[in-house]
């Protein structure tokens, strides 16, 4: 884990902290190391990644489902600092894993997309290659400072586990860094000479935020790094994306490919122009 690159932000964080001793952006500047660098967990706990018995192979399922988001508009609550208690084994495991970065990890974000979904990308020789995607966030301030929410664009993960849960060959989860920005920030700020609090926002980039398994059972992680084909991975990731963004079930095409597709299907062109990517907002 490496803290956020302050040069990627639109605000001058250092200047704001110097000008306001009570600024809760101090928490952002001081968060340069994970809460825990390493953690030992029983193998049996990773069986939560196994698909439900009723699952149809290739269909995604929820590990943590967002049932009624706290704030549909994602606004910052003045008195929320710590996450609710975990209620399922999957929540407990993910809470411990992502809690290695910061203890105040919320497994369901304040606004969609939210939660964690998984899908079996490949099943072979009694081993499941599972991809998962998590939308979580961290509240990194502590009283009396006001809340500051750190929301990664997503965590993308992979688990290679025997279908009976007896062997874990590979585990990793990371915030993708292929885009220019990958973290949203929201915090409460006090207006000068007033008791009124306002929400401020920014967006930036964290260069590295990842979890990895150090000593897998059986084969080494390198053995499994290429065990899934590009087509299998692409198909599985597309299904995960559709869990969080149902509109992606409709095929979208770049402008350069639209004319050819329209001719092939003998259909008219419906044009949609957006300011940024649809699937991960501005991230």
What are the residue ranges of the model-derived segments?
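Local sequence-structure signature of Cys/Sec-based thiol-disulfide redox active-site neighborhoods
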Residues: 240, 248-283
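Conserved thiamine diphosphate
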Residues: 245
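Signature of exported/secreted
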Residues: 1-238
């Amino acid at each position: 884990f490496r803290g956020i690159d302050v040069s990627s932000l639109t605000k001058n964080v250092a200047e704001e902290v110097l000008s306001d001793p009570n600024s809760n952006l101090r928490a952002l500047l001081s968060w340069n190391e994970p809460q825990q660098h390493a953690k030992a967990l029983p193998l049996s706990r990773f069986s939560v990644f196994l698909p439900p018995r009723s699952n149809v192979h290739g269909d995604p399922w929820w590990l943590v489902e967002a049932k009624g988001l706290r704030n549909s508009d994602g606004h910052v609550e003045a008195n929320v600092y710590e996450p609710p208690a975990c209620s399922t084994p999957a929540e407990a495991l993910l809470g411990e894993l992502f809690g290695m970065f910061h203890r105040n990890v919320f497994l369901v974000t304040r606004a969609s997309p939210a939660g964690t979904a998984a899908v079996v990308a490949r099943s072979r020789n009694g081993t499941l290659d599972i991809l998962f995607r998590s939308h979580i966030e961290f509240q990194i301030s502590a009283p009396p400072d006001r809340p500051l929410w750190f929301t990664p664009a997503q965590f993308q993960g992979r688990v290679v586990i025997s279908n009976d849960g007896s062997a874990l060959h590979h585990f990793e989860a990371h915030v993708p860094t292929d885009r220019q920005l990958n973290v949203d920030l929201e915090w409460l700020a006090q207006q000068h000479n007033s008791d009124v609090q306002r929400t401020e926002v920014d967006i930036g980039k964290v260069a590295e935020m990842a979890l990895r398994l150090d000593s897998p059972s059986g084969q080494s992680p390198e053995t499994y790094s290429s065990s899934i084909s590009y087509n299998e991975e692409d198909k599985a990731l597309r299904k995960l994306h559709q869990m969080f963004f149902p509109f992606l079930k409709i095929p979208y095409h770049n402008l350069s490919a639209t004319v050819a597709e329209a001719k092939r299907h003998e259909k008219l062109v419906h044009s949609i122009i957006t300011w940024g990517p649809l699937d991960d907002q501005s991230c």
